[in-house]
Amino acid sequence: MNYFTLFDLPRKFNIDKKLLSQNFYKLQLKFHPDLFINDSESKKKIILEKSIQINKGYKTLKNFLNRAIYFLCLNGYEVKKETLLLKNNDFLIRYFSLYEQLDNLKENNFNKKELNNLEQIIQKKIIYCKKKIELEFEKTRYKKVIKIISELLFFEKIKDVLKKEYNIYLRQIN
């Protein structure tokens, strides 16, 4: 059973997140392992597996990137996050300058104005990628979606690196 069916959602990329949450909690109430504590071991095992499936499905559909990769998989495209970045060299070369800006920030002790500027640039790129992914899914251009996901992964990664480096800097000055 696919996760869209499990949560009684239409099989499309853009989902009603409120409905997803409502259906998740309904399923949790119905299949929570604690409710079956007095049942047979085989029944408890089945319920536990169902509960794990419900939790995994919820986490997959709730997260934009995971939902995109799952939806691609449902449509016959096997996508692995680990290899996506390596396949988009032109993009990586084009945006390597963001890492240079990060290095400059570190050298300048994370100047607030420069930090805010870089954070805004990255966040705008993330939002743009997400909108492009939604649009390409609507047009069923799955190969384009895969390419944009690799770009989104890059921006998410540099956002995480920036946050990590800034936190290291803050610990050093305190």
Swiss-Prot record:
A Pfam family this chain is assigned to: HSCB_C
Domain of life, source organism: Bacteria
SUPFAM superfamilies: Chaperone J-domain, HSC20 (HSCB), C-terminal oligomerisation domain
Keywords of this entry: Chaperone
Family assignment from sequence similarity: Belongs to the HscB family.
Subunit structure comment from the entry: Interacts with HscA and stimulates its ATPase activity. Interacts with IscU.
PANTHER family recorded: IRON-SULFUR CLUSTER CO-CHAPERONE PROTEIN HSCB (PTHR14021:SF15)
Record-given protein name: Co-chaperone protein HscB
Organism phylogeny: Bacteria, Pseudomonadati, Pseudomonadota, Gammaproteobacteria, Enterobacterales
Gene it is expressed from: hscB
